[in-house]
């Protein structure tokens, strides 16, 4: 069975590892290298980095767009039985979809959270379950027929890092099952009426106010990798805990200072801030930050 794989981040890498163990992967498509960080160091995608580090001898393609005759010819020459897609970052044009069955491993229980950030949105909304859907791709955005899915619980301690890890391994196990039993699967159409969509995360999405502790906690979990959570003045809250979600407090009032951190009240609930990072400075313990600002219990945290 000849497989072409399309994927970019570490979620995709885990799925690719599973394919390499059981199938003939004849080509890998991933996004172009791009500048990363303040110094704008040109960095390869996680999938490419993995293949190079493991000395895997498979052709790697990094087109800026799939809508070209060159890409079509490359895929046609590879003659795949299946094209497996996981967080690739581009929509496949009709011509490619017609080359071979294209199966997408989407990190949500479709039709919920179609789009670019399903894991973050499951956390943002405080969901208690999520999963991976294997979908037969069409020209829409995550609208294809469902081939299979698997479900896991979301723990309150989960964040984007842990959930990405769990779902990538779930997808790694699901993908071979779908490929091996593809001819016997009856695809199920998605119910569009139940669909929801999630956009790419923007930096400004990480800004918070001390209004609802549960909302802050869910943002912290969802944005722990990027963009983080921060106040209007740019102060990043690097590490926090949820204290309680029921009591009413003055917004941003410092309720308690201890070695464990700084408890700050919200209009609903409270959080414990353990460490912060002022703009253009290194991260520090929240208690040390308060000392520098000469803030005490009863003051407003800023």
Curated annotation (Swiss-Prot):
Keyword Iron assigned: no
Domain of life: Bacteria
Transmembrane segments: none
Enzyme Commission number: 2.1.2.9
Keyword Protein biosynthesis applies: yes
Entry keyword set: Protein biosynthesis, Transferase
Catalytic activity reported: L-methionyl-tRNA(fMet) + (6R)-10-formyltetrahydrofolate = N-formyl-L-methionyl-tRNA(fMet) + (6S)-5,6,7,8-tetrahydrofolate + H(+)
Residues annotated for (6S)-5,6,7,8-tetrahydrofolate binding in this entry: 108-111
MF terms (GO), sorted A to Z: methionyl-tRNA formyltransferase activity
SUPFAM superfamilies the UniProt entry points to: FMT C-terminal domain-like, Formyltransferase
GO cellular component, one term: cytosol
Signal peptide: none
Function: Attaches a formyl group to the free amino group of methionyl-tRNA(fMet). The formyl group appears to play a dual role in the initiator identity of N-formylmethionyl-tRNA by promoting its recognition by IF2 and preventing the misappropriation of this tRNA by the elongation apparatus.
Matching PANTHER family: METHIONYL-TRNA FORMYLTRANSFERASE (PTHR11138), METHIONYL-TRNA FORMYLTRANSFERASE, MITOCHONDRIAL (PTHR11138:SF5)
Family affiliation: Belongs to the Fmt family.
Protein name: Methionyl-tRNA formyltransferase
Organism of origin: Nitratiruptor sp. (strain SB155-2)
């Amino acid at each position: 069975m000849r497989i072409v794989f399309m994927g970019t981040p570490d979620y995709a890498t885990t799925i690719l590892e599973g394919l390499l163990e059981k199938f003939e992967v004849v080509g890998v498509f991933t996004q172009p290298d791009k500048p990363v960080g303040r110094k704008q160091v040109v960095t390869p995608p996680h999938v490419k980095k993995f293949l190079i580090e493991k000395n895997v001898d498979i052709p790697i393609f990094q087109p800026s767009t799939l809508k070209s005759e060159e890409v079509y010819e490359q895929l046609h020459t590879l003659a795949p039985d299946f094209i497996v897609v996981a967080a690739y970052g581009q929509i496949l044009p009709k011509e490619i979809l017609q080359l071979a069955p294209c199966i997408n491993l989407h990190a949500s229980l479709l039709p919920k959270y179609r789009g670019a950030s399903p894991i973050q949105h499951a956390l943002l909304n405080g969901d208690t379950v999520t999963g991976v859907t294997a979908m037969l791709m069409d020209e829409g955005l995550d609208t294809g027929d469902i081939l299979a899915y698997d479900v896991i619980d979301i723990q309150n301690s989960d964040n984007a890092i842990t959930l990405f890890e769990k779902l990538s391994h779930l997808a790694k196990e699901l993908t071979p099952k779908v490929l091996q039993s593809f001819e016997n699967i009856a695809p199920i159409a998605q119910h569009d009426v139940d669909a929801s969509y999630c956009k790419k995360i923007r930096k400004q999405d990480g800004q918070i106010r001390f209004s609802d502790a549960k909302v802050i906690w869910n943002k912290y979990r969802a944005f722990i990798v990027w963009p983080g959570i921060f106040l209007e003045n740019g102060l990043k809250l690097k590490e926090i805990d949820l204290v309680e979600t029921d009591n009413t407090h003055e917004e941003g009032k410092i309720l308690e200072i201890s070695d464990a951190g700084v408890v700050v009240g919200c209009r609903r609930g409270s959080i414990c801030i353990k460490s912060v990072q002022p703009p253009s400075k290194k991260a520090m313990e929240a208690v040390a930050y308060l000392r520098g600002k000469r803030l005490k219990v009863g003051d407003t945290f800023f």
